[in-house]
Amino acid sequence: MGAPLSTTRRGMGQNLSVPNPLGFFPDHQLDPLFRANSSSPDWDFNTNKDSWPMANKVGVGGYGPGFTPPHGGLLGWSPQAQGVLTTLPADPPPASTNRRSGRKPTPVSPPLRDTHPQAMQWNSTQFHQALLDPRVRALYFPAGGSSSGTQNPAPTIASLTSSIFSKTGGPAMNMDNITSGLLGPLLVLQAVCFLLTKILTIPQSLDSWWTSLNFLGGLPGCPGQNSQSPTSNHLPTSCPPTCPGYRWMCLRRFIIFLFILLLCLIFLLVLLDYQGMLPVCPLLPGSTTTSTGPCKTCTTLAQGTSMFPSCCCSKPSDGNCTCIPIPSSWALGKYLWEWASARFSWLSLLVQFVQWCVGLSPTVWLLVIWMIWYWGPNLCSILSPFIPLLPIFCYLWVSI
């Protein structure tokens, strides 16, 4: 008789029909690379087996939607490994911890509508009445809440990103305020870009107007062209650098820039004078000069809201001086008018002329308005390049 056949129980890792070179997957954890040996080939007694047997059940589409290798998945030919849409019953969680400690699994809590039906009434009055029940209040407020039904403020826990915009549990942000806060700077930026574009066209417009004064019949071709530097036909206001008229165009635009700068400085000077920021002493009666300084003893005290200097003084003759207050507004204008009137006596007639114009009848004013309307288009064509500067001047006048 032959020796009895001894059948050795093959471990799960000994099935090498499916490629598993590193012995990583749960089905082949008894490969030699997974520290399996002939002394412990059995799955139940091998200490090196996987402690997570649920990993064998790969979720549907775990390797991508519809990914099925032609020779089977890496985990075998199971439907789950091949991505077939099959539903596996969920196994209950292991109760090893509960068995060791002697505890039974925690039962599933019944729904709130079965245990506390009064809490499902979302009427405000009934809801607050339901909160009087300690069991209901314990569901909504944490431990240590006040017995009056008010909730103790919980510490706000917010991420770095959310804390920048709003706090957790805070009121929702008002999108109208956010929109208005973003819309304002965008409108200002658009207005600035528009005005800047228009301002950059002022030199070209004034150059065209300046050149048109020499050619009443219209702007002809540039007369600076010659055979030595042939250029295409162009206007005198758009000469290329190769044209001899280019230097004259640059000179005209430089003068125009200086004129615009002078205009802006005059406007700033008028604005500062209107605000009373130019403390200029007026001319003293019967004198063409003034002396500014702190008057310690004055025959007449200065009255006014002048800040610097305290008053305007004449040169003391007998130890005392006459103090005249500085005007709170238009101090420079009054000084220039008095200075010009003292040297040009005919300017005093303009005051009488202005007073006479104020007393004119409405018929005369209608005639003046008609004349302005008749000559207005020509004036508008001349003043149109300066229109973009008007909003800037108005803004400075109001803000300062």
Curated annotation (Swiss-Prot):
Post-translational modification (record): Isoform M is N-terminally acetylated by host at a ratio of 90%, and N-glycosylated by host at the pre-S2 region.
Glycosylated sites: N320
Ranges where the record places region Disordered: 84-117
Transmembrane portions of the chain: 182-202, 254-274, 349-369, 376-398
Ranges facing Virion surface side: 2-181, 275-348, 399-400
Region described as Pre-S2: 120-174
Subcellular location per the Swiss-Prot or TrEMBL entry: Virion membrane
Biological-process GO terms, alphabetical: caveolin-mediated endocytosis of virus by host cell; fusion of virus membrane with host endosome membrane; virion attachment to host cell
Topological domain spans for side Intravirion: 2-253, 203-253, 370-375
Biotechnology: Systematic vaccination of individuals at risk of exposure to the virus has been the main method of controlling the morbidity and mortality associated with hepatitis B. The first hepatitis B vaccine was manufactured by the purification and inactivation of HBsAg obtained from the plasma of chronic hepatitis B virus carriers. The vaccine is now produced by recombinant DNA techniques and expression of the S isoform in yeast cells. The pre-S region do not seem to induce strong enough antigenic response.
Domain of life of the organism encoding this protein: Viruses
Keywords: Acetylation, Caveolin-mediated endocytosis of virus by host, Fusion of virus membrane with host endosomal membrane, Fusion of virus membrane with host membrane, Glycoprotein, Host-virus interaction, Lipoprotein, Membrane, Myristate, Transmembrane, Transmembrane helix, Viral attachment to host cell, Viral envelope protein, Viral penetration into host cytoplasm, Virion, Virus endocytosis by host, Virus entry into host cell
Main location class: virion
GO CC annotations, alphabetized: membrane; viral envelope; virion membrane
A Pfam family annotated for this UniProt entry: vMSA
Family of this protein: Belongs to the orthohepadnavirus major surface antigen family.
Free-text function comment from the UniProt entry: The large envelope protein exists in two topological conformations, one which is termed 'external' or Le-HBsAg and the other 'internal' or Li-HBsAg. In its external conformation the protein attaches the virus to cell receptors and thereby initiating infection. This interaction determines the species specificity and liver tropism. This attachment induces virion internalization predominantly through caveolin-mediated endocytosis. The large envelope protein also assures fusion between virion membrane and endosomal membrane. The middle envelope protein plays an important role in the budding of the virion. It is involved in the induction of budding in a nucleocapsid independent way. In this process the majority of envelope proteins bud to form subviral lipoprotein particles of 22 nm of diameter that do not contain a nucleocapsid.
HAMAP family per UniProt: HBV_HBSAG
Domain comment, as recorded: The large envelope protein is synthesized with the pre-S region at the cytosolic side of the endoplasmic reticulum and, hence will be within the virion after budding. Therefore the pre-S region is not N-glycosylated. Later a post-translational translocation of N-terminal pre-S and TM1 domains occur in about 50% of proteins at the virion surface. These molecules change their topology by an unknown mechanism, resulting in exposure of pre-S region at virion surface.
Protein name as it appears in the record: Large envelope protein
The organism's taxonomic lineage, starting at the top: Viruses, Riboviria, Pararnavirae, Artverviricota, Revtraviricetes
Name of the gene: S
